[in-house]
């Protein structure tokens, strides 16, 4: 099959979160399965700064935005043996950040990504590349399914192309004022309840959900959750309308990238069959961060955005207990100001068992996964989550809240799991979290049982292989909708 991935970020070119990891790793796995896979994203300043062997192409793209014909240049490079196309427009993409600044999102994001979506379709025709499936990701690409359904419905070039739309995080929907319709080149016929209208605003993700041939999201549990009023972010009714076309496919982990046996950032490599290096990495992490190098004290690691979504409202309440307990807590991340201040205050007070590391430090993250005994993810919601998969791979036993992809990957003996690999709790309360932390600390003291639990986690297979096979099935289903 010819499969085109359209995304606003792709590792290593541009990244703000897990979306970029998925849009790099899944294409690589599909390529290994024999498909003609290509990727397209905007040519941001971040991409330009990174180099990446990018070359100028001979094509250009055009799109009418806000009543004006806007032009963009075509550039290209590769991700391994996968062609990567980039659309350049300095007005829209030559900025310091992808989506906005600390003050908020760029006010013209609707125009920026409308230009990108229209540019993608224009470029495909000029290149004479007819994908069997266009796989779109999150609201920034949401106009593509809608345009193919409404504007390109009679266009023979796209008549046999299936469209899949993947929701990575339903909380970010592309909500804009009604007045932005014309700026995106859309007339008033799009502003209806069965299209983009959403409580008087424009909702781009809603349009994609109603227009795509198939919709996927990034875990089976999250797929069920978003169809409920509690977790549907106002779109549960729309998703219910498309229930038969909505599928949950668990994201995988790039096992080539995340492998303790080959990771050059570790103090000593190790594996499930030769796990001795795990202890060396724990000691190295403790020394690096100024913690007491004690093998019998459990290290709890957190690599996360510091936000309420990630459970930091619970952690904030429990910090005094962490400080008083016989454990070491290592935190790496950046995020909301109130949590940054809390952690910086703890750091300033010199709590000897807490290491706070503010910022984005990619060289430290693997050391935390390798040096931690327990990896903590108490998320309020988590569409899929990669941290728990990395932790399992690196022998850090995950402790998670039972939600989204965390519920699909971490299994607790207390819940009747016959092959437990971690600890989980359900009620989103400080009490439920601390009870589970206490359980994990007790379990850590039984060294024989702990070693078995750790090795069972390291033996789990959450690579992209099974997920890619499932996507193959869904691509074929999308093509069947086109009579192919």
Swiss-Prot record:
It catalyses: [(1->4)-alpha-D-glucosyl](n) + ADP-alpha-D-glucose = [(1->4)-alpha-D-glucosyl](n+1) + ADP + H(+). InterPro entries: Glyco_trans_1, GS/SS, Starch_synth_cat_dom. It comes from the Bacteria. CDD domains: GT5_Glycogen_synthase_DULL1-like. One of its GO terms (molecular function) is alpha-1,4-glucan glucosyltransferase (ADP-glucose donor) activity. ADP-alpha-D-glucose binds at residue 15. GO terms for biological process: glycogen biosynthetic process. The keyword Glycosyltransferase applies. Its EC number is 2.4.1.21. The gene is glgA. It holds the Pfam family Glycos_transf_1. This is Glycogen synthase. Belongs to the glycosyltransferase 1 family. Bacterial/plant glycogen synthase subfamily. Pathway: Glycan biosynthesis; glycogen biosynthesis. Keywords: Glycogen biosynthesis, Glycosyltransferase, Transferase. GO terms for cellular component: cytosol. Synthesizes alpha-1,4-glucan chains using ADP-glucose.
């Amino acid at each position: 099959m010819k499969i085109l991935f359209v995304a606003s970020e792709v590792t290593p070119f541009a990244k703000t979160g897990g979306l970029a990891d998925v849009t790099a790793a899944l294409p690589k796995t599909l390529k290994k399965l024999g498909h003609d896979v290509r990727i397209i994203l905007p040519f941001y300043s971040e991409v330009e700064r990174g180099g990446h062997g990018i070359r100028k192409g001979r094509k250009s793209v055009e799109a009418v935005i806000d009543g004006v014909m806007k032009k963009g240049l075509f550039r290209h490079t590769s991700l391994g043996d996968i062609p990567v196309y980039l659309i350049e427009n300095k007005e829209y993409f030559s900025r310091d950040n992808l989506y906005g600044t600390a003050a908020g999102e760029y006010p013209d994001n609707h125009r920026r990504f409308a230009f990108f979506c229209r540019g993608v379709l224009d470029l495909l025709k000029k290149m004479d590349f007819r994908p069997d499936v266009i796989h779109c990701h999150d609201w920034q690409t949401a106009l593509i399914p809608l345009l193919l359904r409404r504007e390109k419905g009679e266009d023979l070039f796209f008549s046999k192309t299936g469209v899949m739309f993947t929701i990575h995080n339903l909380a970010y929907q592309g909500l804009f004022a009604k007045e932005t319709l014309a700026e995106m080149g859309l007339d008033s016929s799009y502003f209806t309840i069965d299209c983009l209208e959403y409580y008087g605003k424009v909702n781009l993700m809603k349009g994609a959900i109603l227009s795509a041939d198939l919709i996927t999201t990034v875990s089976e549990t999250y797929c069920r959750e978003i169809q409920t009023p509690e977790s549907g972010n106002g779109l549960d009714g729309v998703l219910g309308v498309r229930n038969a076309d909505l599928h949950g496919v668990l994201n995988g982990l790039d096992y080539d990238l995340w492998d303790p046996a080959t990771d050059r950032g570790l103090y000593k490599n190790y594996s499930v069959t030769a796990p001795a290096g795990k202890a060396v990495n724990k000691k190295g992490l403790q020394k690096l961060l100024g913690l007491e190098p004690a093998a019998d004290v459990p290290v709890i690691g957190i690599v996360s955005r510091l936000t309420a979504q990630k459970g930091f409202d619970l952690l904030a309440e429990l910090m005094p207990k962490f400080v008083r307990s016989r454990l070491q807590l290592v935190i790496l991340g950046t995020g909301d100001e109130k949590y940054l201040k809390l952690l910086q205050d703890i750091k300033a007070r010199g709590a000897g068992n807490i290491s706070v590391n503010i910022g984005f430090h990619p060289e430290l993250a693997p050391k935390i996964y390798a040096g931690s005994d327990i990896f903590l993810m108490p998320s309020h919601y988590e569409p899929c989550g990669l941290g728990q998969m990395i932790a399992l791979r690196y022998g850090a036993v995950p402790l998670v809240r039972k939600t989204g992809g965390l519920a699909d990957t971490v299994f607790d003996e207390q819940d009747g799991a016959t092959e437990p690999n971690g600890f989980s709790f359900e009620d989103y309360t400080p009490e439920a979290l601390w009870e589970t932390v206490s359980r994990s600390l007790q379990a850590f003291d039984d060294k024989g049982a702990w070693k078995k639990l750790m090795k069972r986690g390291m033996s789990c297979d959450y690579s992209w292989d099974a997920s890619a096979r499932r996507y193959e099935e869904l691509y074929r289903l999308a093509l069947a909708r086109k009579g192919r």
